[in-house]
Each structure stands twice: as structure tokens, then as C-alpha cells.
Amino acid sequence: MEWYWIGLLIVVVLFLLSAVRIVKEYERGVIFRLGRLVGARGPGLFFIIPILENMVVVDLRTVTYDVPSQEVVTKDNVTVKVNAVVYYRVVDPAKAVTEVFDYQYATAQLAQTTLRSIIGQAELDEVLSERDKLNVKLQQIIDEETNPWGIKVTAVEIKDVELPEEMRRIMAMQAEAERERRSKIIRAEGEYQAAMKLREAADVLAQSEGAILLRYLQTLNEISAEQNTTIVMPIPVELLKFFVEKAKS
């Protein structure tokens, strides 16, 4: 008889232990009773009726999913390899359990197919230069598709765009040609500005003989300041005329 009570006590203890569930702060427990959805509970300590009830625990923290590299043909027929990262979390645990068999796998597959679709509709220049725009588009589409599953997609970011080797060489040549073009434009603008300054100076000097002579004498003074230098400079006729006119006056 004593063994009977001991066995009964053990059964009761095991029954109580199997009925206790602890749900963490970042989790929710989706409870089913006789196969019917009761609702999501948590966080805290809960008791369920063994055999009649069961609970599925769902993590509410943000999940980071790395989309594997996808080989895609862009709208302008360029083959590229693209990968991305998707950030999502469960906002409705009951839907995440009842509306889809495996919400994590389903979200991952949807992210891959959507990435291929969006990149395939864009041209290469758009993929390379308008990545933020494509990120927003991807986020909106995936979020809309996963909403019935109780999933919220917070962000999608395209990480790497790998181009074929031949395309990389062509783009490098184009970049070099663009740099050379800009360099030529800058040099041409500099030469144009210098020519304009010289023209302005020539106009000023042409309006005054004294200015021409003054500039000539200034040049002679600068040259004569150099040591160990013998310079033979012709005397301009204008300079002789200037001194003759000064002497007569």
C-alpha cells in the first residue's frame, strides 16, 4: 500500500511539472485546447492541462536573415550576383503559428524570390546607383506578403552586387575616360581664364604708353637683381621716344 501512495505522488508531481510553462519576456506562448486556438499568452508562469492543451512558444525578437547570393539577369541583359539581408520579427504569434507551416522558412523563400524579381525588373545602372530605392521597394513588397502571417519586415538591404569580369573591365575603362574628360575640361577652363586675364592686361597696357614703359622697367629691375648674370636687353623705340619727349618738355 505504501508503494501505491509513493507511485501516486510521483505521478502527481510529474503531472504538475508537465503542466507548468514559463514564457520569457521576449516570447509568447500560443495555447491550443483540444486542437482549437485559445490565444497567445506571456510573459510569465502558466499552467496548461496535459493531454488536453499544448503550447507553442514563439520568439518575438528581430530575426536577421542573410539572403544567399542570387544570380539574376537585369532588365538590360546583364548577369549579376546579388545578396541581401532581411530584418523581420513576429508581431502576431497566433498568426505565425496558424497561418503558415514554418514562418521562418516561408519568409526566407519569399525574400529570395522577391529579390530576384525586383533586380530582374531593374537596369544595371539602377541596381548600382539607386540601391536605397530598391531596398525600400523590397521591404514594402516582402512586408505586404508576410503580413497575413503575423510578420513585420522592418528593413531589407542589398549588400553586394557582383558583376562579370568583362563588365568590371568595361566600367573601369569608362571611369578612366570620364576622369580624363573632366581633367581636360579643367585644363581648358584654366587656359581660358589665363587668356582672358592676359587680354585684359594687354588692353590696359595698350591704353597707356606709360604703363607699358613702367612694366618694362619693372622687368629689367627684376632681372638685374639676379647675381652672376649678364643680360643684353634691347631698348624699345617707345622707351627712347618717351625720354626724348620728356627732355623736350
Curated annotation (Swiss-Prot):
Cellular compartments annotated: Membrane
Keywords tagged on the record: Membrane, Transmembrane, Transmembrane helix
Positions of transmembrane segments: 3-23
Top-rank taxon: Archaea
Cellular component, GO annotation: plasma membrane
First-listed, main subcellular location of the protein, grouped into a coarse class: membrane
SMART domains, sorted: PHB (SM00244)
Membrane topology of this protein: Single-pass membrane protein
InterPro entries (alphabetical): Band-7_stomatin-like, Band_7, Band_7/SPFH_dom_sf, Band_7/stomatin-like_CS, Stomatin_HflK_fam
One Pfam family cited in the UniProt record for this chain: Band_7
Sequence similarity: Belongs to the band 7/mec-2 family.
PANTHER family assigned: AT06885P-RELATED (PTHR10264:SF19), BAND 7 PROTEIN-RELATED (PTHR10264)
Protein name: Uncharacterized protein AF_1420
Native source organism of the sequence: Archaeoglobus fulgidus (strain ATCC 49558 / DSM 4304 / JCM 9628 / NBRC 100126 / VC-16)
